[in-house]
């Protein structure tokens, strides 16, 4: 009788363990955004996907060069309508409290990144680049801003030499993960001569 009870408990345990919830979409972005609302649709990247940037001239040039060289193969367009990635610098963005914050909205027809500064647009682009997979970009709305104003990395170049190319790669990695300071530890001497 006791074996039967144990067998029934094991069977029930296995039965309940095999029941799963509906698969939820997760987002692998570092650092994790403040607010994520994903949907089932996808924005598909194709040869017709363009890039439209509405920002100050300096920010526009930097962002355009960066995205054209990225793995997304975007080409600049002169109108925001169409199957495009759109970056807009706006005067106000009530959803965020930081100039480095952004709102990334992805629909099946368009990707829209809004921010109040070039830095906010850049960090929105980093999130978008981390989200891209073989299917495209998952639809949804991401609202994000940094939790800390100073997000840095220290590299000790006083005790070990790093060449210029290595430091550039490190800077690209820091930007990808939205770190905004590179501290180069140049010397251990008490004075700088």
Which sequence ranges carry the predicted segments?
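Bacterial Sec-dependent N-terminal signal peptides
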Residues: 1-28
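Acidic, contiguous N-terminal accessory segments
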Residues: 19-151
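Flexible loop/turn segments at secondary-structure boundaries
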Residues: 59, 161-162, 189-193
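The substrate-binding groove and active-site-proximal loops of carbohydrate-active enzymes
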Residues: 115, 151-164
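Catalytic alpha/beta active-site cores
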Residues: 151, 171, 184-185
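Short, acidic/polar
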Residues: 162-174
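Aromatic-lined carbohydrate-binding/catalytic grooves of carbohydrate-active enzymes
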Residues: 177-193
């Amino acid at each position: 009788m006791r074996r039967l009870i144990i067998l029934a408990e094991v069977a029930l345990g296995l039965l309940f363990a095999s029941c799963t919830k509906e698969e939820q979409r997760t987002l692998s972005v570092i650092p994790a955004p403040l607010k994520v609302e994903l949907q089932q649709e996808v924005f598909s990247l194709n040869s017709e996907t363009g890039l439209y940037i509405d920002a100050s001239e300096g920010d526009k040039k930097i962002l355009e060069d960066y995205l054209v060289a990225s793995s997304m193969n975007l080409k600049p367009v002169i109108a925001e309508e169409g199957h495009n990635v759109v970056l807009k610098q706006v005067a106000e963005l009530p959803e965020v409290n930081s100039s480095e914050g952004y709102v990334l909205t992805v629909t099946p027809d368009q990707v829209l990144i809004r921010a109040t500064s070039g830095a906010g647009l850049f960090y929105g682009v980093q999130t978008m680049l981390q989200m891209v997979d073989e299917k495209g970009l998952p639809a949804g709305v991401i609202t994000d801003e940094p939790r800390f104003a100073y997000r840095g990395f220290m590299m000790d170049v006083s005790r070990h030499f790093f060449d210029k190319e290595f430091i550039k790669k490190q800077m690209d990695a820091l930007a990808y993960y939205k770190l905004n300071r590179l501290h180069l530890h140049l010397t251990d001497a008490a004075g700088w001569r």
